[in-house]
Amino acid sequence: MSKYRKLTETEIQQLKSQFCTADNWDDIEVALDFNPEHVSYTRFSGTIKLGTFDGEFILAGGMKKHAGLYHTTLHNVTVGNGCCIENVKNYIANYVIGDYTFIENVDIILVDGESRFGNGVEVAVLNETGGREVMIHDRLSAHQAYIMALYRHRPVLIERMKAVIEKYADENASEIGYIGNHVTIVDSGYIKNVKIGDFAKIEGASSLKNGSINSNENASVHVGVGVIGEDFIISTGSSVEDGVTFSKCFIGQACHLGHNYSATDSLFFCNCQG
């Protein structure tokens, strides 16, 4: 979806009648075939772009919910086609949200300032007093981590590797976060500076800060009830659930962490379980 238009006066009046407010209605752009019927009790501020709200979501138990915006506050947000965003306690700020994404009963989702979404975080592996830090990023491999941790007698190599990672992290830094297509975020708390890939499911997470959830259609990521994470990367096909607490961690592909597991300054590569 690339073409937008301003709201018509009739649409503005209809939105007002549906208890919507805006700091400036001129800052809102909508898809060419936008219909305001399914937008109610919503507050807009900053730059807003809205797609269409056609279609329904079929939830567990057969419950159906129509796409739309209900009881939410959006600030500097782009919403794709066919999304349902409902019952956001505080607000969503500085995000691009993809198509057919379902967000319900969350506290707050925001990006505050420029974020690198977990890229470039130094993880103190092997020696908890430091000296063998590994810089995590979306493309980290076990081989690269091994060299960074154990080849400290090659300082030129280590500095070059750090420079490459810093460059990647800076290139991916942004003041705008991303929530992909077909994402589900429900019954969750505080989500700040987190990039969320396609088809991810976040159900009941307590707090997620400064991280990347690198989910995709073929290998989705699940973040479950009570999870608390900060300074992290979660790779494709992994699940983190059942009250896991983790900080400064890289979680590789197809890993499973659960049962109140706790981790700090740790690297989990493919197929690990905790």
Language-model features: locations:
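Domain-scale signature associated with acetyltransferase and cell-envelope carbohydrate enzymes
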Residues: M1-G274
